[in-house]
Design a protein with these regions (language model features):
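A structure-centric signal for secondary-structure junctions around beta-strands
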Residues: 1, 55, 134-135
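Short active-site neighborhood of thiol/selenol oxidoreductases, capturing the structured segment around
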Residues: 1-13
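Generic intrinsically disordered, low-complexity segments enriched for polar/acidic and small residues
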Residues: 4-5, 69, 74, 85, ...
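Generic serine detector
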Residues: 2, 51-53, 112, 154
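Structural alpha/beta surface segment adjacent to cysteine/selenocysteine redox centers
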Residues: 10, 16-96
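C-terminal cap of thioredoxin/glutaredoxin-like
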Residues: 19-30, 94-166
Length: 166
């Protein structure tokens, strides 16, 4: 089974489009396992008070809780790009995903900063260790596909990559 790393940020509309294209293509590739790699589209220094990303930190909480990450990702992309959930309000974010995660528990975890280091480690893994230039980006079997700045990845490019990289 091939492992596909998908690098993305929930606040990136091109990532949302790439995510949905990936979901459509996965049905034709049951031999591909997706490893989600959330990372900030514009990483800020850790000391910056706005350096936290609730969607990404919530991802690590959801992963720890064993939540279906396809459901979580779909919901958070919708919240960030369509419903425009306040990306800096812990309680509003937790309320938005309350049918997936306990809002009180999630709010406490987000406020505590428990997953902030994982967020920064994910950024380092994407940009420093894997040479991601633009997101969404894909890595599989030593092959890579990065988005084109301001355009993203087309469904055709994604489908071609999945076939060639296996």
């Amino acid at each position: 089974m091939s492992k596909l790393e998908f690098f993305f940020d929930y606040d990136c509309p091109f990532c949302m489009r790439g995510y949905h294209a990936l979901l459509e293509n996965l049905a034709q590739h049951p031999d591909i396992e997706v490893i989600w790699r959330p990372c900030d589209i514009n990483p800020l220094p850790e000391a910056n008070p706005y350096s936290y990303n609730l969607g990404i930190q919530g991802y690590y909480f959801a992963e720890e809780k064993g939540i279906d990450l396809f459901e979580y990702n779909t919901r958070v992309f919708q919240g960030a790009n369509v419903d425009r959930v306040d990306r800096y309000d812990h309680a509003k974010f937790a309320e938005y995903v309350k049918d997936l995660l306990d809002p009180e528990e999630l709010t406490e975890a987000l406020r505590s900063g428990k997953y902030k280091e994982k967020q920064f480690a994910g950024n380092d893994y994407a940009y420093e260790q894997n040479g991601v230039w633009y997101i969404p980006a894909l890595r599989m079997n030593g092959k890579k596909l990065d988005a084109t700045g301001g355009l993203g990845i087309s469904e055709k490019e994604l489908a071609k990559f999945l076939k060639k990289a296996k």
